[in-house]
Amino acid sequence: MTTNKDVECLVEPTSNISITEENKNVTSETTTTTNNTQNKETETTDNINKEETADKENKEEQQQEENPENLIKHPLQNRWSLWYDYQSGKINPEHWVDSLKKVISFDSVEDFWCVFNNLPNVSNLKQGSSYHLFKDDIEPKWEHESNKRGGKWFVMVKDKSRCDNQWLQSVMACVGETFDSSDEICGIVYNSRKNGDKISVWTKTAQDEKATRDVGNCLKKILEIDQTIQYTPHEDFIRSSKGSKNLYEC
């Protein structure tokens, strides 16, 4: 390989050329060194900025976690439990509870939304399926102590495109205690059936006509319907599997 010294020997009469070559090499090395230094400085600055951003985000997250307001949940007046059942064929009144399963319970606004934001919509329920949302100490059974002297308002779902919103609105009215005579409310049920879906609100005291009618009228407002709805007592179902007569209408 030809070195700078070799160049000097070969071109002694015109030594200025060798000086120029050396200057070029020095300039090139200086430029390369300068660029490397600038790149390192830029890389260092970027790393510092990233670390500062990460530290800031970590501090903000820590402050949010330490903020007591972020840890406070808004309690509901009652604790509620969600149940599910599926009937593959004709419902046998004596054995239908065998498929009834308790899914989850909640007692705060935050937990309510956590449950319902992850719950399949009623419009997607398989035919034969039902959701039951009841106060935690009440099982969704006719013969339960809180239900056996009561009954239910039931509404046939005529517009399937509205069923998800109607179900959600009626559920929120239950857990939010916005029904008139809300103390009478035991729970609410959504049935997906071949012959038509149905929303039912269960109450405690069938013979309390005023309180029962208050619930029925409020349900119609919540669902935004003008159709006539019926109320049937559980007592008739308990006595006979043939069903019961409507006690009230509104």
Curated annotation (Swiss-Prot):
Q: Which molecular function term from Gene Ontology is one that the record holds?
A: RNA 7-methylguanosine cap binding
Question: What cellular component terms from Gene Ontology apply here?
Answer: eukaryotic translation initiation factor 4F complex
- In which residue ranges is the amino acid composition biased (Low complexity)? 25-39
Question: From start to end residue, where is composition biased (Basic and acidic residues)?
Answer: 40-62
* Annotated binding of mRNA, by residue: 96-97, 142-143, 193-198, 239-241
Keywords assigned: Initiation factor, Protein biosynthesis, RNA-binding, Translation regulation
Q: Name one GO biological process term.
A: hyperosmotic response
Q: Which parts of the sequence are annotated with region: Disordered?
A: 1-72
Any Pfam family hit? IF4E
Q: How does it assemble?
A: eIF4F is a multi-subunit complex, the composition of which varies with external and internal environmental conditions. It is composed of at least eif4a, eif4e and eif4g.
Q: Which family does it belong to?
A: Belongs to the eukaryotic initiation factor 4E family.
According to its UniProt entry, what is the function of this protein? Recognizes and binds the 7-methylguanosine-containing mRNA cap during an early step in the initiation of protein synthesis and facilitates ribosome binding by inducing the unwinding of the mRNAs secondary structures.
Q: What is this protein called?
A: Eukaryotic translation initiation factor 4E
